Amino acid sequence: MIGRLRGVLTSKTPPWLVVDVCGVGYELEVPMSTFCELPDVGYEVNLFTHYTQKDDSAALYGFLSESERRLFRHLQRVSGIGTKIALAILSSVSVDTFAGLIQAGDANALTVIPGVGKKTAERMLVELRDRAADFNNGISTSGKLNLDTVSEAALALQQLGYKPAEAARMARDAGTESDDVAIVIKKALQTVLR
């Protein structure tokens, strides 16, 4: 239907935005990972899209990368996961990190994501394990220990008052090769203070 939009960003209020394409304003809902990377209003954007039609409503979702959209679509096929949880997952972790968690079989790390409980995490592991390479472009992700460290750091940042999605993003962006949670937290907080 609508696979991609390129136009001028005219409105931006999390998690919604409006993109003007030749005089038509398309309203899209985007994950916070996409929202945080968008330019200011008035600049051109290029987004991959996913259109859904339900009984009484239609919705358009936007993503910066093809791999984000691909993961969103794979998540929609998992029993019990709707658009809200799929967006929460994409807002909390990168595609590569998520693929690494699936490949490592780490249900506990998945439960850190808002809206994902133990049963949902286990269901995702079962239903997505064979497809993990599909949504991260075949990139091999290593470091289960590093992913555990990032998850622990995200939990610690939540305890400091950061919202779950923001804490997950901060920990992911600060993730290092170190297995020391304190180092990841320190790096995340230093980035915020700059």
Curated annotation (Swiss-Prot):
The protein's name in its UniProt record: Holliday junction branch migration complex subunit RuvA
Source species of the chain: Xylella fastidiosa (strain Temecula1 / ATCC 700964)
GO terms (BP aspect): DNA recombination; DNA repair
GO cellular component, one term: cytoplasm
Highest taxon above the source species: Bacteria
Domain remark in the UniProt entry: Has three domains with a flexible linker between the domains II and III and assumes an 'L' shape. Domain III is highly mobile and contacts RuvB.
Gene Ontology terms, MF aspect: ATP binding; four-way junction DNA binding; four-way junction helicase activity
Lineage of the organism: Bacteria, Pseudomonadati, Pseudomonadota, Gammaproteobacteria, Lysobacterales
Function recorded in the entry: The RuvA-RuvB-RuvC complex processes Holliday junction (HJ) DNA during genetic recombination and DNA repair, while the RuvA-RuvB complex plays an important role in the rescue of blocked DNA replication forks via replication fork reversal (RFR). RuvA specifically binds to HJ cruciform DNA, conferring on it an open structure. The RuvB hexamer acts as an ATP-dependent pump, pulling dsDNA into and through the RuvAB complex. HJ branch migration allows RuvC to scan DNA until it finds its consensus sequence, where it cleaves and resolves the cruciform DNA.
Pfam families named in the record: HHH_5 (PF14520), RuvA_C (PF07499), RuvA_N (PF01330)
Span list, region Domain I: 1-64
Summary of subunit composition and partner proteins: Homotetramer. Forms an RuvA(8)-RuvB(12)-Holliday junction (HJ) complex. HJ DNA is sandwiched between 2 RuvA tetramers; dsDNA enters through RuvA and exits via RuvB. An RuvB hexamer assembles on each DNA strand where it exits the tetramer. Each RuvB hexamer is contacted by two RuvA subunits (via domain III) on 2 adjacent RuvB subunits; this complex drives branch migration. In the full resolvosome a probable DNA-RuvA(4)-RuvB(12)-RuvC(2) complex forms which resolves the HJ.
